[in-house]
């Protein structure tokens, strides 16, 4: 069965900076997915990438997401890591608690 090793946690980042949202799964067999404020977010080179690309592709369980060039409009919000079930017979999909990512403004 898949289970959490590390769930996403609160992060702060300056505009234009990079930030890694952790998400590590034990016995990962399903696929990693990310959502921001309830909306799916895909992997996009130059913006959203796997923090450890070789790890995410393998079964190591590291689904951590790296946000590049953070900005308030696209990146500030509540992020969730999700993992699809190991197989259609198992109900071991995972949905993390929401973790806030705060893009600091110029106040």
Where is each model-derived feature located?
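Solvent-exposed loop segments of extracellular immunoglobulin-like
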Residues: 28-33
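Short beta-strand element of the conserved SAM-dependent methyltransferase core
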Residues: 64-65, 101
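Solvent-exposed loop/turn motifs of extracellular immunoglobulin-like beta-sandwich domains
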Residues: 13-22, 58-62, 69-82
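Eukaryotic intrinsically disordered and solvent-exposed regulatory patches
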Residues: 6-9, 17-21, 66-67, 87-88
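Immunoglobulin-superfamily Ig-like beta-sandwich domains in protein ectodomains
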Residues: 1-5, 9, 35-64
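Non-cytosolic beta-sheet module surface loops
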Residues: 23-27
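Extracellular/luminal immunoglobulin-like beta-sandwich modules
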Residues: 78-107
């Amino acid at each position: 069965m898949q289970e959490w090793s590390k769930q996403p946690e609160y992060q702060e980042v300056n505009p234009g900076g990079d930030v890694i949202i952790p998400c590590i799964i034990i016995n990962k067999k399903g696929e990693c997915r990310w959502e921001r404020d309830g909306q799916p977010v895909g992997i996009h080179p130059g913006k959203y990438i796997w923090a450890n690309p070789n790890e995410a592709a393998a079964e190591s369980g590291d689904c951590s997401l790296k946000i590049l060039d953070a900005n308030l409009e696209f990146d500030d919000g509540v992020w969730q890591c999700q993992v699809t079930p190991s197989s259609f017979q198992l109900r071991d999909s995972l949905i993390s608690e929401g973790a806030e990512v705060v893009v600091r403004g110029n106040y």
